[in-house]
């Protein structure tokens, strides 16, 4: 196990950005940067023993600063949308930036994924990022300190087979001196055939869930929890593995309201994992576990028109 730190370029204001690469005993690695506490690459072996980078990202800090897709970052203070950029807490109405049409998204245009975090090497296989957000920043109350730690392990015990596997553990911590909303996540885009391999429509996906949260036309939750055995929910059903792209062109109100798949699935409490994805091309299997009650399925619906310069110019 080892952690390597190297320069990752500079931001427009001249601040230097660093890249941290953790390599495990299986020769597989993950790279993370202090800009946005972002995952920039995940290198794992395919069925033929070749390394593939399965995380979308950019080559340097300048390209990350220009992109608006939250590639690999930690959005905050609140991931996802807040209607009309307003919320009420303890009788006070707070007004936030509306950076997604009429709504607030991922903490606004200065969200945590667009901030330079303080980094430290926590161990031989983990890196920790810490960020301070003062009271009133972007309209939110409370002085907040958040930490995110990435730990990269290797084990010979698999979930579904006896193959060796790498394990990425993401740990979050937030502290505030006042009540405030805080909802952190990681926004990595995965392609198990490789970041430069195009569509994930052929990936097989299973989600351990019987219900999902309904969206309105602005991709905001309506408050209705839809069961997957309802007739109009068939296209949303991943209880049995199916290709992600099998139904995504169907004329269905749920897909229209999300501009594709961009929905929260309510996870079964007794499940040992939340979701698994696999692609026959590479043979790479990804399993997701969580302590949280929901999982967001997002199929990169807005990437095509985002003008992002990805790794290697992709």
Predicted segment positions?
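An exposed, glycine/acidic-rich loop-and-rim segment of catalytic or binding clefts
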Residues: 1-314
């Amino acid at each position: 196990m080892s952690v390597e730190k190297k320069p990752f370029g500079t931001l427009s204001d001249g601040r230097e950005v660093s890249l941290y690469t953790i390599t495990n005993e299986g020769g597989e690695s993950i790279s993370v940067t202090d800009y946005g506490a972002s995952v920039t690459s995940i290198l794992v072996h395919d069925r033929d023993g070749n390394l593939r980078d399965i995380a979308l990202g950019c080559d340097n800090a300048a390209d990350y600063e220009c992109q608006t897709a939250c590639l690999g970052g930690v959005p905050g203070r609140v991931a996802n949308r807040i209607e009309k950029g307003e919320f009420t807490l303890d009788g006070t109405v707070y007004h936030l930036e509306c950076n997604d049409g009429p709504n607030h998204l991922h903490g606004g245009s200065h969200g945590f994924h667009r901030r330079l975090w303080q980094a430290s090497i926590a161990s031989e296989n983990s890196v920790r990022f810490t960020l301070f957000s003062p009271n009133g920043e972007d309209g939110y109350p409370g002085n907040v300190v958040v930490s995110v730690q990435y730990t990269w392990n290797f084990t010979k015990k698999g979930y579904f087979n006896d193959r060796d596997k790498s394990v990425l553990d993401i740990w979050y911590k937030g502290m505030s001196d006042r009540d405030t909303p805080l909802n952190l996540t990681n926004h990595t885009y995965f392609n198990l055939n490789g970041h430069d391999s195009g569509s994930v429509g052929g990936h097989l996906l299973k989600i351990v869930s019987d219900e999902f949260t309904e969206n309105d036309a602005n991709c905001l939750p309506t408050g209705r929890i839809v069961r997957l055995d309802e007739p109009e929910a068939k296209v949303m059903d991943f209880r049995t593995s199916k290709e992600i792209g099998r139904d995504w062109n169907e004329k269905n109100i749920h897909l229209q309201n999300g501009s594709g798949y961009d929905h929260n699935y309510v996870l079964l409490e007794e499940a040992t994992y939340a979701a698994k994805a696999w692609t026959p091309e590479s043979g790479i299997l990804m399993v997701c576990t969580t302590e949280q009650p929901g999982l967001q399925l997002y199929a990169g619906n807005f990437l095509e028109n985002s003008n992002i310069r990805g790794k290697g110019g992709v």
